[in-house]
Amino acid sequence: MTSCSNCGTTLIGDFCQACGQKRFVESDRRFGHLLSQFAASATDLDGRFWRTIRALAFQPGLLSREYFDGRRARWISPVSLFLAVSVVYFIAPSLGGDLTLQFNQQVSGRLRQLALGPDETLSAQQLASSGQPYSALTAPWIEKRVHQRDEAARAASGGTSGYSYRDYRLAYDAKANDVSKALVILHVPIAALALLLMFAGQRRYYAEHFVFALHYLSFWMLSLQVVLQLSNLLNLLPAVLHPPDAAYDWLMRTLLPAYAVFAVRRAYSTGWPKALLGAFGLVAAIVLFNLFVYHAVQFVVTFALT
């Protein structure tokens, strides 16, 4: 009699009656077996991963509702889903509608002008801009860093070359997108807190609202990649048929709040008025967090890395 390689139980058939693992055979050691497993997983449209992705995209709020009600075996966990989508989001190109602020969006018009390239210009509005609410506080950081690096560069080159604000702008912009994507998870606890307050009457655990936030942010990242691919496809058309870049941004601005309404209504089993109010609170919390906290954190982290 053969024993299960996983738990040691004596096997009766091809699968262990105790733990469910398939009987181990010599061919399982070969590379072909590994490839066949990968192919099966990638093409199994009834598998948990693809089933979960379909539900996330086309049935707003269903995954959260199923989690609340304890029906979890058919779906991958909210954390696993978020991590999987995050990996795709992190490695994909950036597109308008994401959360990245480049150097010129983080600083005042004065520093923007100092960081201009030889063939670049700024509008009067851009020059007059005060930047972000915290830009006046962070401007001395940038000035000190550029000054120190300029002195070091001149000392090392005997005065033949230095370090400019434009040099720092390019270094900052090269890192900002990755930092922004890595920090997107910071929105989850804030969104969950907003939902906890909006639906306090349902007496749900904070962890349940956290799950909804994971699902919502997963959809946000996934939909952004779909819009990116749509943009790439439309760019294959003649230039006269290309939609303006702002169209993709407005598509996301419309899609995400609408999705939030349907998701809240299903997940929290509430009527349309409460769903609209809950979705408004969710989106407002994310927007306010972006304006007053997230962008500042993004700047500090990017500054520390550049």
Predicted regions mapped to residue ranges:
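Membrane-proximal intrinsically disordered regions of secretory-pathway and membrane-system proteins
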Residues: 1-306
